[in-house]
């Protein structure tokens, strides 16, 4: 059994109280006994370190709370912008795409592609450049890759990427004409780091252009068969004598 002197007990009792309530302010303990003095000094240092750590933990907790609030605000803002983008892309009648180019002018057919929008001309699962290229008409596939490579290889960024291609719909129906266009973001050396664009169905417009071109060809043939000359005038501001009026003459009028 260990026995303590009265002096030792006189020191240990307040030390026990100090350890029971370490955060309560009190006068530092002291003793004439060298061993007790070392113990009291060590305990006081540990309590001070504990207090400092608690203060640091309190500050870190407050900082984490502030960061959580900022992250929550950013998440709310992100969801808001995502909802706006979904609304815009859904109402645009176009598909929007992103291509991972990885800083190369000749992207691999395995490069990832992401699509957003509501158009139904694209088959599901088109998540790579190669899969997308396979959906094009065989006569358009290499032309599509060549146009893409020329755009990415031009470090000045002046070569556009705009191309009319034929796409086979998921239903397996006849190919439809679509226009794919895009642009790339480049680093300081002009190497592409990101690329994106849109895909728009222009099939009806293409058919109308063909009809218009056929009508123009027929008109030219009919005009050449006539012996009478034809002419028309574009009247500016309703003034037949306006010198800015444009007059067109058929070839018979020039003979």
UniProtKB/Swiss-Prot annotation:
User: Record's superkingdom?
Assistant: Bacteria
* InterPro entries per record: PAC, PAS, PAS-like_dom_sf, PAS_fold_3
Recorded hits in Pfam families, A to Z, give: PAS_3 (PF08447)
What is the name of the protein in this document?
A: Uncharacterized protein in P47K 3'region
